[in-house]
């Protein structure tokens, strides 16, 4: 769950040396046969591929890669050249003139800034600028504004993943040379893809997030029973504090989420940005489009005080994971965020037998509430050999710091010492 917007970067880095690059024509690149069997095509819009065809490859277990999600981002104007997220999705097809078959797909964007990625490379852009080089545009395989690990390259059954990964990497390098992109970044991939890309000599980067895991709890109290006495009392006080103020919660799913709910929720979401003098990444049209096109994946938790809503949190339902994504409120209240974003989600997972909550970026305070620190990954290809070497050295040192932090942070978990969770 996004707790708050992240600090804005310094101005002047967002469009470095892209004046002579027509970003709107990226997807017009001529299809080049890459192997005797397959060819790669880059498309400037998700509308250039049929939704059923795309979704057959991506599956339904990870909602953010669904055609409907990417389409909502485009149609609402959240991903385009103006926002720095120009779609350029990669399709791998059989190399036949008649009825080519889609056998792999990958989300891809040409980026002219580093906003909304949650893997921070502003210092890399700084270094390029200091040496008179352009860091932007860069190529990014990610889900915009969504720091949730999941599939990044989806491949048909019976096709060698290693072959597709090699093929895509080769074509990415050609594309980067053609459009003068500095690099390719694969953000929050699954471990198997990260390993495969490491074998192709992409640099590997680690990060940390906090996730909740369901040990087949029968109820919230059974989860609390795993806490030490003091931590258990603290959490119960937090929930009691909210209940004593007369705040009640509605867990709305699918078509039970109506237009007025979206209006209230967007007011909450927007407030988390406006209070810091920033415009939100997403607009109200994006959320209403999600409600129309993929309601089966949505859980909206709304907090009501007396006769009006005061806070809300939006979750996405995956195959075995509840993804906490956006939240906001119009009344600041102690513990309201924890109840709306964490405890309501835990209640829902226990009731519905969901294995895990992925709460997104940030939030060290989640640890003492039972969210475990977990390692996240990203993979990076840097075209410039000298910068690639320098960044590799930086990442080696950073990775050690991350590993040390993961071990240290785990010591702050609230669980009883006699339990192994």
Regions found by a protein language model. Give the residues of each.
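N-acyltransferase acceptor-side catalytic subdomain
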Residues: 1-421
């Amino acid at each position: 769950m996004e707790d708050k917007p992240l600090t804005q970067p310094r101005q002047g880095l967002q469009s470095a040396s892209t004046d002579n690059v027509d970003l709107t024509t990226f997807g017009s690149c001529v299809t080049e046969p890459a192997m005797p069997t397959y060819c790669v095509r880059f498309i400037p819009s998700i509308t250039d591929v049929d939704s059923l065809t795309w979704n057959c490859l991506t599956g339904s277990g990870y909602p953010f890669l669904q055609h409907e999600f990417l389409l909502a981002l485009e149609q609402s104007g959240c991903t385009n050249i103006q926002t720095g997220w120009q779609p350029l999705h990669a399709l791998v097809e059989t190399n036949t003139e008649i009825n080519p078959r889609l056998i792999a797909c990958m989300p891809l964007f040409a980026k002219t800034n580093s906003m909304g990625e949650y893997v921070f490379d502003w210092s890399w852009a700084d270094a390029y600028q200091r040496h008179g080089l352009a860091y932007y545009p860069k190529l990014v395989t990610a889900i915009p504004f969504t720091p949730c690990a999941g599939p990044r390259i989806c491949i048909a059954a019976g096709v060698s993943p290693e072959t597709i990964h090699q093929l895509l990497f080769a074509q990415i390098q050609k594309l980067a040379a053609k459009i003068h992109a500095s690099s390719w970044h694969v953000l929050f991939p699954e471990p198997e893809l990260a390993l495969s890309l490491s074998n192709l000599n992409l640099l590997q980067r680690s990060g940390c997030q906090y996730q909740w895991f369901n040990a087949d709890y029968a109820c919230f109290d059974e989860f609390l029973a795993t806490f030490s006495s003091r931590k258990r009392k603290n959490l119960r006080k937090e929930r009691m504090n909210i209940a004593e103020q007369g705040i009640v919660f509605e867990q709305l799913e699918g078509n039970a989420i109506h237009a007025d709910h979206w209006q209230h929720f967007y007011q909450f979401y927007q407030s988390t940005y406006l209070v810091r003098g920033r415009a939100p990444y997403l607009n109200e049209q994006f959320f209403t489009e999600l409600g129309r096109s993929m309601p089966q994946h949505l859980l909206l938790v709304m907090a009501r005080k007396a006769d009006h809503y005061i806070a809300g949190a939006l979750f996405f339902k995956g195959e075995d994971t509840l993804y906490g994504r956006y939240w906001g409120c119009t009344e600041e209240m102690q513990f309201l965020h924890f109840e709306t974003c964490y405890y309501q989600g835990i209640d829902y997972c226990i009731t519905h037998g969901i294995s895990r909550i992925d709460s997104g970026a940030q939030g060290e305070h989640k640890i003492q509430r039972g969210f475990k620190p977990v390692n996240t990954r990203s993979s990076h290809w840097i075209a410039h050999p000298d910068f690639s070497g320098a960044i590799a050295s930086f990442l080696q040192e950073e990775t050690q710091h991350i590993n040390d932090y993961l071990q240290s942070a785990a010591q702050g978990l609230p669980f009883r010492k006699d339990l192994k969770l």
